[in-house]
């Protein structure tokens, strides 16, 4: 039975940051675990399934190369570029991951800002990183466009890191919708005087 331990879709910029080799363009990183025989079978099965779907290059990373690639994937927000302007997390349905990544890359390209996009494709969580060097207005514009396209897909977007000047233009938290009223009531019960970090949480709570 094919049971991948990881299923990450990465764009070309992320692929270069991970130094996994292969042709330019997007890549699907698939983690498999088990005894050597299980791992070999799963790798062969993955290739058998994906070849008819357009797979053009398949390679197995093991040992230090594998560990380095997954470490770099985990540190993408800090390591994709020499300088990072902002990191945003998107949450969408898994079936929409590829589309929103493509739209997000196009938005960054229009603004002239390099971007690295990577997703835990099986659960619909996308990490979007903007390279530093851009002016505040351009960074804020891209983050705003990203949030709009994620919302259009029925998802939510969170600004994980950005300079204060950008956060003053783009809310860190997305609109929580009707749930905000419930959270406000809970907050008022737990902190009636409004002393605990007022305005720091979603919806200005």
What are these model-predicted stretches?
Residues 1-57:
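Acidic, glycine-rich loop-and-beta core segments that form the ion-binding/anion-interacting portion
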Residues 10-12, 21-23, 47-205:
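Conserved glycine-rich FAD pyrophosphate-binding loop
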